[in-house]
Amino acid sequence: MDKMLYLAFGLSQNYPNPFNPSTTIGFSVASEGFVSLNVYDITGRMVSTLVEGNLSTGYHSVVWNGIDNNGMSVSAGIYIYALQTETSSITRKMVFMK
């Protein structure tokens, strides 16, 4: 795999999408530092924190199982996932089906 891919900040489309019961979200971090990856419902309410902490440069992935921060299954619908660092942010949409 091309090493240049790891030098960019990026957020991949989740797969599968639509999903049930879980989906994988891949992302790349350009430099070591604080990273957060959160899931929001269509109204903008944060429903799940998937990553929150310092990560090394490179490619990372996380699996979301449709469970919110309170341990409850979320409703079917469209969700936004947002990757943020100290200097950059990017969002994408995903669909949870029941």
Name what the model sees in each region.
Residues M1-Y15, F19-Y40, T49-E52, S61-W64:
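Glycine-centered coil/turn sites that cap beta-strands in beta-rich domains
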Residues D41-I42, D68:
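Short, acidic, Ser/Thr-enriched surface-loop or helix-capping motifs
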Residues R45:
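Conserved Rossmann-like nucleotide-cofactor binding loop
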Residues S88-R92:
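Extracellular and select intracellular beta-sandwich modules with Ser/Thr-enriched
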Residues M94-K98:
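Short beta-strand edge segments in extracellular beta-sheet folds
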